[in-house]
Regions:
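Conserved pre-motif I regulatory segment
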Residues: 1-24
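Walker A/P-loop
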Residues: 18-38
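Conserved strand-helix element at the start of the C-terminal RecA-like helicase core
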Residues: 32, 47-57, 189-202
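Loop/turn-to-beta-strand initiation segments
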Residues: 46, 71-74, 89-92, 116-120
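Inter-Walker segment of RecA-like/P-loop motor cores
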Residues: 50-89
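Post-DEXD/H (motif II) to motif III coupling segment of the RecA-like Helicase ATP-binding lobe
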Residues: 100-160
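Conserved interdomain linker/interface between the two RecA-like ATPase lobes of SF2 helicase motors
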Residues: 142-202
């Protein structure tokens, strides 16, 4: 068992203590794997997973396949369609990327949460303002936080590396920039002059 696996199990246990709240776990840590640990313990029959876009749904399905976890009992929905499920009762409600809920979606969640007693919010980028809103509007507290600094220090994730690749601007091919014919380099030079004038840079 890797340290990442161990931490995922630990955070699953933290949430399972109350079966209510938000896990604020840094990007690339494994929020879905943490949730799978929760599902294995709860053994739910009906689960609702809400996500902001289809790419995230695909991530869930990919992880379930990789872990050989059957997801036939799971209802998937977008944040936008949460209102369609607000009157139903589930063994577990998972709201992924909970920090992205709009005001209207939070309103739909109020009814949903009144009808359900096991709610897991997932995020990796939770501002203090959003944390306060989710607590006051939905009574969802942060059950645990694992920052990117902690994950890097423990070697659970690798630090970001940024590589800058410099390429010369094309000064031969003429392009159309809002009706003006210029090369890429001349357009760039013009943009730089404009920025300097705006900010009084000599």
């Amino acid at each position: 068992m890797t340290l990442r696996d161990k931490r995922q199990k630990e955070f699953a246990e933290v949430w399972l203590n109350s079966k209510w709240g938000i896990l604020n776990l840094c990007p690339r840590f494994g929020k879905i794997r943490t949730t799978i640990n929760i599902l294995k313990k709860l053994k739910p029959v009906h689960v609702l997973i809400a996500y902001p876009d289809v790419k995230i749904k695909e991530s869930w399905q990919d992880e379930f396949r990789e872990c050989e976890y059957v997801d036939g009992f799971i209802t998937y929905t977008t944040h936008l369609s949460l209102h369609k499920y607000q009157d139903y009762n589930y063994d577990l409600v998972v709201i992924d990327e909970i920090h992205l809920l709009s005001e209207a979606q939070i309103e739909a969640c109020k009814t949903l949460l009144e009808n359900n007693d096991k709610v897991l919010g997932l995020t990796g980028t939770l501002s203090k303002s959003t944390e306060s809103t989710l607590l006051s509007e939905l009574d969802l507290h942060v059950a645990a936080t694992y920052t990117i600094e902690q994950a890097i220090n423990e070697g659970v994730i690798v630090d970001y590396q940024i590589t800058v690749i410099k390429v010369p601007l094309d000064n031969i091919t003429v392009n159309d920039y809002k009706g003006k014919k210029r090369t890429e380099k001349k357009q760039f030079d013009k943009s730089i002059r404009k920025i300097r004038r705006k900010h009084y840079v000599p």
